[in-house]
């Protein structure tokens, strides 16, 4: 599922992504579902994270959605420190708009208006394609203010990692995005409750 468009569409062409039903899920979510509906669907799906721990994605979204805060964040951890690991790289290079769409849906579900993609600087093709995808999505009104005319605002920034293995760990990555040395934080509190800049983060 995650790789369905890789090698099928031109990853630098938003129209090709849209032609294979890209951004339809975001449109459906924003126009016919509540944030709780989205969290419930993800919970029922049984989807788990790709990082190895297998934590249920819906549970994490539920924790963040239920956390009371005026500011929340969605962070994509695309910092692969394991030698020879290309799980994230494959998706980022082959289907970057899918990553952006998923992050926007997650943002709606938890009440976030800002996202970050933390990607290794050693992946220049992935970085380049993400930059193009973000620019295209903004031009099409799929990132930024009032997406699909619904009043939902969500934008994404790139942050380049310096290749430190430890920044693959989620709390170290958050510390790095904040501009500090990437060192893991004690848990609890977990990022879904107190994450980036001390705010709920998935």
Sequence positions of predicted segments:
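A structural-propensity feature for long, helix-poor, extended segments
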Residues: 75-94, 110-113, 118, 128
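Gly-rich Lys/Arg/Thr-decorated short loops/hinges at beta-loop-alpha junctions or inter-strand turns
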Residues: 9, 17-24, 76-88, 191-197
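Hydrophobic alpha-helical positions that pack around
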Residues: 127-202
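Iron-sulfur (Fe-S) cluster-binding modules
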Residues: 1-45, 112-117
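Short coil/turn connectors at secondary-structure junctions
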Residues: 35-38, 44, 68-73, 86-87, ...
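Histidine-anchored nucleotide/phosphate-binding helix
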Residues: 95-109
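Conserved phosphate/anionic-ligand binding catalytic regions in large, soluble enzymes, centered on
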Residues: 44-64, 106, 161-175, 179-181
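Structural signal for hydrophobic packing residues in well-ordered secondary-structure cores
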Residues: 18, 30, 34, 42-46, ...
């Amino acid at each position: 599922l995650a790789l369905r468009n890789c090698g099928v569409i031109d990853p630098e062409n938003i129209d090709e992504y849209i032609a294979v039903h890209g951004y339809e899920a975001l449109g459906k979510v924003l126009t016919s579902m509540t944030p709780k509906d989205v969290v419930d669907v993800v919970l029922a799906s049984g989807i788990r994270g790709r990082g190895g721990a297998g934590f249920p994605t819906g549970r994490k979204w539920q924790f963040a959605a239920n956390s009371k805060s005026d500011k929340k964040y969605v962070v994509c951890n695309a910092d692969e420190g394991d030698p020879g690991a290309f799980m994230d790289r494959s998706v980022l290079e082959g289907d970057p708009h899918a990553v952006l769409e998923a992050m926007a849906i997650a943002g709606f579900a938890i009440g976030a208006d800002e996202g970050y993609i933390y990607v290794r600087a050693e992946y220049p093709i992935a970085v380049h394609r993400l930059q193009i995808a973000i620019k295209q999505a903004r031009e099409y009104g799929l990132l930024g203010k009032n997406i699909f005319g619904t009043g939902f605002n969500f934008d994404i920034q790139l942050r380049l990692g310096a290749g430190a293995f430890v920044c693959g760990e989620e709390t170290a990555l958050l510390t790095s995005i904040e501009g500090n040395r990437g060192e893991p934080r004690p848990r609890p509190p977990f990022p879904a409750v107190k994450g980036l800049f001390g705010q709920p983060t998935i």
